[in-house]
């Protein structure tokens, strides 16, 4: 099973069409294949433990389960992820399953308006010996079209968190151990090739015709 991360939808006006469009946009169109290009698990239950061994969610969804996270705050999501991590550490000594608790996405009301999504990563103190992970998450907003690549680069440690942010402006003086909001610093255009963008847009357009996106 491939490694994946959770998606929480807290937006109050996110219907199944928007969620399908979002999940298709954050698919790995550049390098993925049918069984590997979806890397995110949609979480709708607030009462059940976060499913660390759940398969990734594969759009299009035909129906949306009752979403208990609707209207929740980002702080509630962070608290749930931290609590799940503590449960796993206590039971096994380390987190089990492919689902990555150190990275997750949150689709909130602003995400519906401007087609961004909140990308969160567990805070880390690089100066501590050994490394420590403060109970908080660094976060920034990234466009839907950049979310997969940003997530992937962080997941495989190809790019550090601070490298993605704008140190010359609002983030000056911040540290990755802080667990605070950062300013997205990737000012390049979407990196998905034109060929694969056409494939993606064609799938979304087809689903629009079917009333599913």
Residue spans of the language-model regions?
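Extended, charge-biased low-complexity segments
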Residues: 1-142, 206-213
